[in-house]
Amino acid sequence: MNRAILSQRITSILADLNRLTNALYAMNTTDIQRYPDNYEVLSTDAALRAENIACRLRHLIYSTTSIKKEEYLTSAAVMQGIKVDENDGVLEITLPCLLPKRKQRQSTEYLLDPFTAAMSQYARSRPLPRLQHCVVCFSHVYCQDLPKRQVRDYDNLELKQFLDVAASFILTDDSGLLCDAYNTNELGETDCTRISIT
């Protein structure tokens, strides 16, 4: 990559890091009890900005180093805490956050790419069944310490892309005739999403 273009991209990321830092300072000084809407806007902006920065840095790594995308994303999956396990015939996937809202492309990429790498690594380490009919349950776990109004509608969440990735490894077809999908909300110690497939 041309050094001038590389420098321009790094400078752009540094500018976004400054904006992220400012958003975090603003979050830290905002009274969440008195100004919950302001806090929501600030925290959403900070999270999306951080995810955008991470994705841009990934693309920089892919285009400027010899590190393979799959290798990096496997490390990213571990760092994010993405877990894939099988217990008593149920494939259990844990994502370290709530699923992104639809139409937040960068946010989806941030989580979806490492999730795909984690599924691929898991499939290489042990044989996975090819299910013809299955039940999928998305458990949206919300931190019990946060206000209950944080609970979101299912129809605003990006479920399909995550189901498509899982389906590519274990389902013969994710057609509505062969795959029953359910959603549930829970309160827990921290935000996360659990996907159970049987």
PLM region descriptions:
Residues 175-198:
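C-terminal edge-of-domain segments
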Residues 83-87, 127-132, 187:
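Short glycine/proline-enriched loop/turn "hinge" motifs that connect secondary-structure elements
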Residues 149, 168-178:
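Short conserved catalytic/interaction loops centered on acidic-Pro-aromatic/His motifs
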Residues 83-99, 137-142:
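Short amphipathic
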Residues 1-72, 76-81, 85-89:
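N-terminal targeting/trafficking signals and adjacent low-complexity tails
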Residues 149-166:
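Short, low-complexity, polybasic intrinsically disordered segments
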Residues 107-150:
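An N-terminal amphipathic alpha-helical segment
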Residues 87-90, 104-109:
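Long, charged, low-complexity intrinsically disordered regions
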